[in-house]
Amino acid sequence: MKALGNISHVSNKGRIIARSDRTQQLGAPVFTSDGKRIGKVHDIFGPTRNPYISIKPSRAINPEKFENRVGETLYVGIKNVKKWGRRKRRRK
């Protein structure tokens, strides 16, 4: 796992906003320091050098609990990359 960034705040829509030093792949899973999965990367916005990353929490996670964890480091896992392009037909 690679370090994603630090929690900045929780948005009005329940997204966890983190400040990062690099962009991440959309849909990549996000973990806490103890390895618990909290959600996935939903959106990236802001300046290119230090973007903000919006994290959509999993249904089991209450985003209000992260309001008191501001400054905690989050980590990103490796997402399986889907292959783009045309699929070949199977012969019967």
From Swiss-Prot:
Note one Pfam family from the annotation.
Gar1
List the GO biological process terms: pseudouridine synthesis; ribosome biogenesis
- The protein's superkingdom reads Archaea
Record-linked InterPro entries: Gar1/Naf1_Cbf5-bd_sf, H/ACA_rnp_Gar1/Naf1, Transl_B-barrel_sf
Family under the similarity heading? To M.jannaschii MJ0782.1.
Q: What is this protein called?
A: Uncharacterized protein MTH_886
Q: Which organism is it from?
A: Methanothermobacter thermautotrophicus (strain ATCC 29096 / DSM 1053 / JCM 10044 / NBRC 100330 / Delta H) (Methanobacterium thermoautotrophicum)
